């Protein structure tokens, strides 16, 4: 039991750790010579730049970027010198957007969410299964799906994000038991015979629309397009000029 308790303490909320370096977490690496998705112990390096000058950096055991944004900004001593935060879609989440709105209201952020580019495609915009493409009646608060099945607002629900602890609020819509035709009543049910349901997150939708408005403005498009020329060369220099492709444990 003591062994498991010690391991749980080392995990510190992670799913894995290296026995030879407890701070390292097993991750998928970009360099996968065997092409088999092998996991290797490593770190997630975060760097903040301006005009290709590094103004802040940190190492994290989290494989995903979005969990590093908040602690990284908090440990950055010269953050008050800047009025913009620019990052790629790996950092775009409801938690991070909400955090930026609350903690850094004086800074404008240019961060797309994961589905930002995909939502702009013709395939997505014409996909009848997406809630965003359904007809919505704001007055009576109901949706009609691609077949004409009506979904009425049923109740509010909450879900707690295990990785961040954030409580997310949803509106649940349920297919009405009584539709216009028997065929629609059949389509309103799942294979198990229950009424179909869909969930809508008003806060997440608001934050996405706000991020989209900023990114699609002429100024936003220019600022975000410069991100890859500003920060990506830093990692290119580290890897290809200085040969830093792995860390070395000394002890």
Stretches with model-predicted labels:
Residues 1-251:
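Anion-binding and metal-coordination hotspots
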């Amino acid at each position: 039991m003591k062994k498991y308790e010690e391991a749980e303490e080392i995990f510190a909320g992670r799913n894995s750790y290296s026995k030879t370096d407890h701070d390292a977490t097993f991750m998928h690496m970009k360099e996968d010579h065997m092409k088999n998705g092998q996991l290797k112990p490593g770190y997630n390096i975060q760097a903040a730049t301006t005009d290709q000058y590094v103004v802040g950096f940190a190492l994290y055991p989290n494989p995903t970027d979005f969990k590093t944004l908040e602690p990284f900004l908090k440990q950055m001593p010269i953050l008050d010198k800047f009025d913009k935060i620019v990052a790629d879609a790996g950092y775009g989440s409801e938690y991070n957007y909400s955090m930026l709105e609350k903690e850094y209201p004086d800074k404008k952020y240019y961060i797309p969410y994961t589905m930002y580019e995909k939502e702009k495609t013709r395939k997505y915009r014409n996909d009848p299964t997406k809630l965003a493409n359904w007809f919505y009646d704001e007055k009576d608060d109901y949706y009609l799906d691609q077949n004409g099945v009506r979904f009425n607002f049923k109740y509010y629900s909450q879900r707690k994000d295990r990785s961040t602890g954030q409580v997310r609020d949803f509106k649940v819509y349920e297919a009405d038991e009584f539709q216009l035709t028997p065929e629609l009543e059949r389509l309103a049910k799942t294979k198990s015979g229950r009424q179909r349901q869909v969930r809508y997150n008003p806060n997440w939708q608001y934050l996405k629309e706000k991020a989209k408005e900023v990114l699609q403005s002429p100024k936003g498009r220019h600022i975000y397009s410069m991100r890859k020329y500003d920060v990506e060369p830093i990692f290119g220099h580290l890897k290809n000029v200085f040969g830093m492709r792995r860390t070395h444990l000394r002890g």
